C-alpha cells in the first residue's frame, strides 16, 4: 500500500503554499476498482457512512441529484475527535476519469478557511488489479495562524481505506 497509516499520508503528500493559499495531495492504493470507489462519492455518497461509521455519520442530498454538478450535499462527520458538518456543492463530475470535485459552501471548515475545494480522482492501477485514489485539496486560510489542513488529508486517507474494505466485502 502507498500509505501505511494516516500519518504516513503526509510523507507522500505534496504541499504548495504561499502565505494563505495552499494545496495538499496524496495517493492511496486500494484493492477496489476505480469505478466502484468513484461511484461511492458520485452515485451513492449517502452509503459512505455505512463504510466509515466512526468517521462519517451521514450524508444528505439538499438540492439536485446525486452526482450532478450544482447539487448540494450535507455531511456529518468526526474529524480530530469533534463532530463537524459540511455543506458542499458538486463542482465537477467526470465519470470517464472517475473524478468528482466538491466545494465547501458552509460548515466547520469555513471557520478557518475562506475556501476549501476537494477533488477525488481514482485511476486503475497499471498492470494489475486495484486502483489509486488521488485526493487533492485546495484552500485559502482565513489568516496565517490557521494550520494547513494536513489532519484533514489524513482523515481522507483513513476514509479511503475503510471504503475500500467495505467495497471488497460487498463483492
Curated annotation (Swiss-Prot):
PANTHER family: MLP-LIKE PROTEIN 423. Signal peptide: none annotated. Gene3D superfamilies: 3.30.530.20. Pfam families: Bet_v_1 (PF00407). The lineage of its organism: Eukaryota, Viridiplantae, Streptophyta, Embryophyta, Tracheophyta. This is MLP-like protein 31. GO terms for biological process: defense response. Transmembrane segments: none annotated. Belongs to the MLP family.
